[in-house]
Amino acid sequence: MKARSARAGRLAVLHLLSWLALGCPSPGRTSTAAGLADGPTRWLMLPEELRQVQRMRTNREAVDWLETFWRRRDPDPDLPGNDTARTFYQRVEAADRLYSEAGIRGSLTARGRVLILLGPPPVLRYGQKRVPAWEPGRPGDRPDIQTRDVVLESWVYAVEDCPRTLRERIAQEEPDLKEMVLVFLVEPRRTELLEGEKYLELAVRASVLDPGS
């Protein structure tokens, strides 16, 4: 079974490398390491894992690191394939189709990140909020302060429907929480996450099933 699991892990790595080809290399790093640090895989990384990737200098380091990365998140190492990796690829593809913004891949946007970590929202809510807006005007003039309406989009997840590992994390942090609400500010060319960052951090930590590997 271990040999089969190792082969499955290598296949997952090879699959992911095809996604990394879409990343942008950074000076001093291989394209593989740059793709890891700058691409959608970073949404799944613990802070210490991101630091490890940023120190990589060879493709061999990146490939070895990836095998360990996915092995730590494999829900059943004795079976071929890795459901966590498979779900990740599917969600990246969906995010790229649905949420691209001003030339940015959908999987690298705020909504793409949430889709990758939590899945599609069972409930969507929309609202508006009036916020200050100002025009600087000419030098020496007072800025013209007005207000404008912005669109708020909320993604709602019932805690009872979350994966077991995430439910356990939430129970430790917020035992009375019934639903997670993530709120986005939606503008024509960009979307920003306003509320819910803590739930994404919990989801990242809950995805690590074998911390010691």
Give names to the regions the model predicted:
Residues P25-S213:
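Residues within mature, well-folded domains
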Residues K2-L14:
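Bacterial N-terminal signal peptides that target proteins for export
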Residues A12-G23:
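Bacterial N-terminal signal peptides
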